[in-house]
């Protein structure tokens, strides 16, 4: 896995959904505009100790438009993560963008807001992403998007 190729995480997610059975549509076919990108702290932010308060985010343009995926990732934080943590972060953001999930209150869920814990292992990830695909985690809530005509 190439740590710096964010598109590969999208491709893994799309294939994982297809293989899971019941995970949803073929997001690769459905998504017409894929924008997954790194953000970098500028020199003045670095010197002052100020950095963005998020590691990654999806945006309105993505989660309220079924044809778009728009996810930004803070490179400085990303580069410190192991593979399982990177998968967890990206699946979390795809959960917002593709499934329109809000955050969960259960730390065992991918949709929990702080998902870069060091105690996450491969089995934790598999269980959490399977629950996400099946839409079967407690307190599931969806992002509200405006109706379009």
Where are these regions (language model features)?
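Residue-level detector of short, conserved catalytic/binding motifs and their immediate flanks
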Residues: 86-87, 109
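Auxiliary, metal-adjacent structural segments of Zn-dependent hydrolase domains
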Residues: 8-63
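Active-site-proximal beta-strand/loop segments in catalytic clefts of secreted hydrolases
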Residues: 36-43, 74-76, 93, 112-116
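Post-signal/leader-peptide non-cytosolic segments of secretory proteins
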Residues: 38, 66-69, 84, 97
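Metalloprotease/metallohydrolase-associated module, dominated by Zn2+-dependent proteases
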Residues: 1-3, 9, 54-72, 78-80, ...
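Active-site recognition of the HExxH zinc-binding catalytic motif
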Residues: 87-101
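Short, surface-exposed loop and linker segments with low hydrophobicity and enrichment for Pro/Ser/Thr
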Residues: 27-29, 64, 79-85
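Short, surface-exposed alpha-helical recognition segments that flank or form part
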Residues: 4, 38-39, 81-82
